[in-house]
């Protein structure tokens, strides 16, 4: 039977108290972030009537906004917490790509490692909302694997950056950036250079794509689906999350699995044991981008000197910040410290 521990009580309080002084150690930590990127666009307005043309609401637009999305949000989370993010991704030759570059620069993330593919548009996700209610989402994207020539450029770009990096994050949104061959080549070369690889997996990607990575961070539903186990038959079992995690660890051939569990917190499954951590979310307005924040903060902390359980708690606190906000937003260093102080005062 797997040994289980919990980070709680006085041990948790002491760990949280240590975070402010340890944040400085992350300021020079460099992470390569690889993944599909795009713009999250919002059209906000009021609904007062139904269209006479069709039974749909008419949105009277009040404001519009664009934010960094997908792996670009991971990169800006790394930067906003004080690290350095080298973002490797593919964009189209269009105005959305130019907007992305501007927003990356303003978020202290260099756009210099983006690769242009004229055959595909830059991904955009347009959300039309009235108050907190989503009316519709419109996706502008092309889901297909890269050409051999563009994929080769992506791999070469990562290879060139590895010498100066401390670790690698692969953010998989299953839009075709990384084939199995490319992902495996990146993982193996990263290990050959002594760099840890952190993966946020996608439920539709075969588990073998991630073989050999050091840490994978699925949410509970993704973990169950990727494990191949039947959640309906297991949900009444108190140890089901351990069975899912261990099955996933073996199936993916990875060292460590971190399963984010919403209000139930987070569980780390290693070859030796399992560690449970509580949630730090006090109010949940929007979980969009929470997984991006978790892997960014966790990877930054771990390669910056935190043990893996400590890094998980660090990531959990950062996620508690962003779920209390609306939309895809990063956790800044100031936000983190303010939220941490409020947690300690309430403890």
Language model feature labels by segment:
Residues 32-34, 137, 166-169, 198, ...:
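Structural motif
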Residues 26, 162-163, 210-211:
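A short, aliphatic-rich alpha-helical micro-motif
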Residues 176-274:
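Conserved phosphate/ATP/ADP-binding segment of small-molecule kinases
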Residues 114-120, 127-162:
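Conserved phosphate-binding/catalytic loop of the ribokinase/pfkB sugar-kinase fold
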Residues 7-23, 52, 56-124, 339-344:
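Substrate-binding N-lobe of the ribokinase-like
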Residues 3-48:
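Positively charged, low-complexity intrinsically disordered leader regions
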Residues 164-177:
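Short acidic, glycine-rich surface-loop motifs adjacent to enzyme active sites
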Residues 255-256, 280-343:
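Conserved post-catalytic alpha-helical subdomain immediately downstream of the catalytic base
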């Amino acid at each position: 039977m797997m040994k289980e521990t919990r980070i709680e009580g006085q041990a948790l309080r002491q760990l949280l108290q240590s975070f402010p002084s340890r944040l400085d150690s992350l300021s020079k930590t460099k992470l390569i972030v690889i993944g599909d990127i795009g713009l999250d666009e919002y059209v906000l307005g009021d609904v007062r009537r139904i269209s006479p043309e069709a039974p749909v609401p008419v949105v009277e637009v009040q404001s519009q906004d664009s934010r960094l999305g997908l792996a670009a949000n991971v990169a800006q989370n790394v930067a906003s917490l004080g690290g350095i993010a080298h973002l490797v991704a593919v964009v189209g030759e269009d105005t959305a790509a130019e907007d992305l570059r501007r927003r990356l620069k303003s978020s202290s993330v260099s756009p210099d490692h983006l690769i242009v593919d004229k055959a595909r548009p830059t991904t955009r996700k347009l959300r039309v909302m009235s108050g907190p209610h989503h009316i519709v989402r419109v996706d502008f994207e092309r889901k297909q694997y890269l050409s051999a020539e563009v994929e080769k450029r992506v791999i070469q770009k990562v290879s060139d950056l590895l010498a100066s990096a401390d670790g690698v994050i692969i953010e998989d949104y299953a839009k075709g950036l990384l084939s199995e061959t490319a992902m495996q080549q990146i993982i193996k070369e990263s290990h050959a250079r002594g760099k840890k690889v952190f993966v946020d997996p996608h439920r539709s990607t075969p588990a073998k794509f991630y073989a050999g990575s050091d840490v994978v961070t699925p949410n509970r539903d993704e973990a169950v689906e990727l494990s191949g186990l039947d959640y309906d038959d297991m949900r009444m079992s108190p140890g089901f999350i351990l069975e899912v995690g261990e099955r996933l660890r073996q199936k993916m051939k990875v060292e460590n699995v971190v399963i984010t569990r919403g209000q139930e917190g987070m569980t780390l499954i290693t070859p030796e044991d399992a560690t449970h951590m509580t949630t730090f979310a006090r109010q949940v307005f929007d979980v969009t981008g929470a997984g991006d924040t978790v892997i960014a903060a966790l990877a930054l902390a771990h390669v910056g000197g935190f043990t893996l359980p400590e890094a998980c708690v660090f990531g959990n606190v950062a996620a508690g910040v962003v779920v209390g906000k609306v939309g895809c937003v990063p956790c800044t260093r100031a936000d983190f410290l303010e939220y941490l102080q409020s947690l300690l005062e309430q403890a």
